[in-house]
C-alpha cells in the first residue's frame, strides 16, 4: 500500500534594522520590530492560517485518515505568540487532533549542527520544550535546518536518542535509487532516514501554476494518479514543502488550497494512505542504506550548504559567531542569550550569497554582510565584557564543566520530580 507523507515547514527570521558602524557599543537592540510584525502577519494571514484551517478540514472530512507533519522553529513560535496569537490557537487545535506530528528542529533555524554540537543539542532541547509547553506534544522526528544531513550528524542524533531524520532525496546521493522508501543511516543502523521526493514536492512549490509546465493544469485527481502510478514497493512518498507554497508562492487564486483539500478524497479512493514521519518509520522497515559524508540539504541546485557557506563573507560571519559559543554558554544574561539565538538564523547568511539572494532588503550581498557584521561586532563586545578573552581556556573549560554538571543534576532532579507526581 502506498502512503503519502506530507510535511509543511514554517520559519521566518527576525528582520534586522539598519545598523551602522558608529552605533557599535551604544545600541544593543538589533531588530526592526515593525517590519518583523508586518511580515509575520502577512505570512499568517496569506498562508499559514488558511493552510492550517485547510489541514483541519482535511482531517475532519477524511474522518481522521488524513495525517501530516509540521516543522516550526522556536523563533517562529515566539513570533506567533508576540504578533499573531491566533496562529497558536489553530496549532493547538491541530495538535489536539493527534493527526499532526510536530517535528524537532533547531530553535533558531541555525547551522549549529555543523559548527557547535553542544549548541545544537541545546537548541533541539529548547524547541522540544517549547512544543511540549505550548502544544502539549513531544517531538520524535528531526527536521534539521534546510533538511541538513551528514553521516556524522545522524550518528550524533542517534546518541541523543532520536530514531528518525528527514533529508533531501538528491540525485547525486541516491543515484538510481528511489526516495520512496525508508532508509537507514550508514553511520548508525538504528537511525531511519526519510527522503523528500524532490520532483513531486516541486510540482506544488514551483510548477503548480506554471502554464509552461508539462503537467499544467494540475488538480488533485491528476496528482493522485501520478502517485498511484509509481512502481509497486515504493511505500512512502514524501512530499515536503515550505508552508508559504500555499497562498504566497502559489496564491489562493491558483486553486492551491482547493487542490490540497481535495487530495485526501482522491488518494483514499485509490487506496493510498497518509502517514506522519514517525508513523512511517515505525510501521515500515528500512529497505536501503543512505550515506552522505558531506552536507546534504534541499537548498539550491547543488543541494548542499553552498548557498549559506559558499563565500568568504559567509565564512567570516560564521567563524566569528561560533567562536564565542562556549563563552555564551556560560552567560546568564537573558538579552544576550536571545540575541545569540536570533543571530544564528541561516537567512542572514543567505542574504550574503552573491548568486542567489532571493527576496532581501539589501542592495547586495556585501551590504547584507556589512549590516550583519556591525551587529555582530556589538554582540561580540557584549560577550567580551561578560567573559573576556583573557580568561584562560583551562579556566573556561572548568567553568563549563561545572555548569554542565549542574545542568545534568537539575535534569535528574526534574525527572525524579515528574515520576513522583505520577
Segments the model singles out, each with a brief description of its role:
Residues 143-147, 167-169, 195-196, 240-242:
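Short His-Asn-centered micro-motif
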Residues 87-104, 137, 158-178, 183-195:
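Acidic, His- and aromatic-enriched active-site or binding-groove loops in soluble protein domains
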Residues 52-56, 88-92, 121-131, 154, ...:
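Generic structural signal for well-ordered alpha-helices
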Residues 3-8, 14-116, 140-143, 163-168, ...:
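Short, well-structured secondary-structure segments
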Residues 81-84, 150-158:
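Distinct, well-ordered alpha-helical segments
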Residues 119-146, 225-240:
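CE4/NodB-like, metal-dependent polysaccharide N-deacetylase domain
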Residues 1-47, 181-191, 195, 210-213, ...:
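Active-site and substrate-binding clefts of carbohydrate-active enzymes
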Residues 113-115, 173-181, 203-205, 286:
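Short, charged, surface-exposed secondary-structure boundary motifs
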Amino acid at each position: 500500500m502506498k502512503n503519502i507523507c506530507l510535511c509543511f515547514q514554517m520559519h521566518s527570521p527576525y528582520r534586522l534594522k539598519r545598523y551602522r558602524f558608529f552605533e557599535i557599543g551604544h545600541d544593543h537592540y538589533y531588530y526592526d520590530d515593525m517590519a518583523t510584525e508586518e511580515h509575520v502577519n502577512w505570512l499568517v494571514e496569506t498562508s499559514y492560517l488558511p493552510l492550517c484551517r485547510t489541514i483541519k478540514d482535511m482531517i475532519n472530512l477524511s474522518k481522521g485518515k488524513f495525517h501530516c507533519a509540521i516543522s516550526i522553529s522556536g523563533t517562529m513560535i515566539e513570533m506567533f505568540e508576540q504578533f499573531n496569537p491566533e496562529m497558536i490557537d489553530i496549532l493547538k487545535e491541530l495538535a489536539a487532533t493527534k493527526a499532526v506530528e510536530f517535528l524537532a528542529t533547531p530553535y533558531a533555524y541555525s547551522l549549529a549542527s555543523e559548527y557547535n554540537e553542544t549548541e545544537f543539542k541545546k537548541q533541539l532541547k529548547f524547541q522540544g520544550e517549547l512544543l511540549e509547553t505550548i502544544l502539549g506534544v513531544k517531538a520524535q522526528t528531526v527536521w534539521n535546518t534546510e533538511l541538513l544531513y551528514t553521516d556524522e550528524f545522524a550518528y550524533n542524533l542517534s546518541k541523543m536518542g532520536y530514531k528518525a531524520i528527514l533529508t533531501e532525496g538528491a540525485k547525486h546521493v541516491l543515484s538510481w535509487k528511489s526516495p520512496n522508501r525508508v532508509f537507514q543511516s550508514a553511520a548508525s543502523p538504528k537511525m531511519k532516514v526519510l527522503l523528500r521526493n524532490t520532483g513531486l514536492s516541486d510540482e506544488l512549490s514551483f510548477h503548480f501554476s506554471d502554464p509552461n509546465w508539462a503537467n499544467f493544469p494540475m488538480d488533485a485527481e491528476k496528482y493522485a494518479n501520478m502517485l498511484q502510478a509509481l512502481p509497486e514497493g515504493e511505500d512512502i512518498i514524501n512530499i515536503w514543502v515550505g508552508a508559504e507554497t500555499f497562498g504566497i508562492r502559489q496564491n489562493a487564486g491558483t486553486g492551491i488550497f482547493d487542490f490540497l483539500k481535495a487530495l485526501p478524497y482522491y488518494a483514499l479512493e485509490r487506496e493510498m494512505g497518509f502517514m506522519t514521519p514517525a508513523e512511517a518509520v515505525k510501521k515500515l522497515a528500512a529497505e536501503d542504506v543512505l550515506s552522505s559524508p558531506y552536507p546534504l540539504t534541499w537548498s539550491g541546485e547543488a543541494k548542499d550548504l553552498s548557498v549559506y557557506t559558499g563565500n568568504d563573507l559567509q565564512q567570516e560571519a560564521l567563524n566569528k559567531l561560533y567562536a564565542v559559543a562556549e563563552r555564551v554558554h556560560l552567560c546568564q544574561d537573558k538579552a544576550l542569550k536571545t540575541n545569540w539565538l536570533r543571530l544564528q538564523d541561516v537567512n542572514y547568511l543567505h542574504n550574503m550569497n552573491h548568486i542567489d539572494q532571493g527576496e532581501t532588503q539589501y542592495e547586495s550581498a556585501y551590504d547584507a554582510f556589512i549590516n550583519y557584521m556591525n551587529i555582530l561586532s556589538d554582540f561580540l563586545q557584549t560577550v567580551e565584557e561578560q567573559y573576556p578573552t583573557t580568561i584562560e581556556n583551562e579556566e573556561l573549560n572548568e567553568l563549563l564543566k561545572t555548569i554542565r554538571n549542574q545542568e545534568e543534576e537539575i535534569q535528574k532532579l526534574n525527572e525524579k520530580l515528574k515520576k513522583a507526581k505520577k
